[in-house]
Amino acid sequence: MNRSMIALCVVLMVSLVSAQVFDLDGQQLAGLEQNDARLMEQQVKRSPSAKWMRFGKRSPSAKWMRFGKRSPSAKWMRFGKRSGAEAVSEQDY
């Protein structure tokens, strides 16, 4: 009887210790995810024009204006669709 009680206590203590270790891992993971979110926010703050300037390219709107063409969004609006990206996602395969 005493051995079974001791074994039960040991099993309970081991399970509690393992639960705490897993909880610490979860807290560390949450901390890493918060750090990743902060890094992503810093990258998102860059304006689209800064991205195009960084690569030495014209912005997409300037490209369409330069050649006197309609922009892709204007083309889709002419045919009654909301945008090119949504039209692609609505296609049946």
Curated annotation (Swiss-Prot):
<feature type="propeptide">
    <location>
        <begin position="20"/>
        <end position="46"/>
    </location>
</feature>
<comment type="similarity">
    <text>Belongs to the FARP (FMRFamide related peptide) family.</text>
</comment>
<feature type="modified residue" description="Phenylalanine amide">
    <location>
        <position position="55"/>
    </location>
</feature>
<comment type="function">
    <text>SPSAKWMRF-amide: Acts as a ligand for the npr-22 receptor in vitro.</text>
</comment>
<keyword id="KW-0165">Cleavage on pair of basic residues</keyword>
<dbReference type="GO" id="GO:0071855">
    <property type="term" value="F:neuropeptide receptor binding"/>
</dbReference>
<keyword id="KW-0677">Repeat</keyword>
<dbReference type="GO" id="GO:0005576">
    <property type="term" value="C:extracellular region"/>
</dbReference>
<keyword id="KW-0527">Neuropeptide</keyword>
<comment type="function">
    <text>FMRFamides and FMRFamide-like peptides are neuropeptides.</text>
</comment>
<dbReference type="GO" id="GO:0007218">
    <property type="term" value="P:neuropeptide signaling pathway"/>
</dbReference>
<protein>
    <recommendedName>
        <fullName>FMRFamide-like neuropeptides 22</fullName>
    </recommendedName>
</protein>
<feature type="modified residue" description="Phenylalanine amide">
    <location>
        <position position="67"/>
    </location>
</feature>
<feature type="modified residue" description="Phenylalanine amide">
    <location>
        <position position="79"/>
    </location>
</feature>
<keyword id="KW-0964">Secreted</keyword>
<feature type="propeptide">
    <location>
        <begin position="83"/>
        <end position="93"/>
    </location>
</feature>
<keyword id="KW-0732">Signal</keyword>
<feature type="signal peptide">
    <location>
        <begin position="1"/>
        <end position="19"/>
    </location>
</feature>
<keyword id="KW-0027">Amidation</keyword>
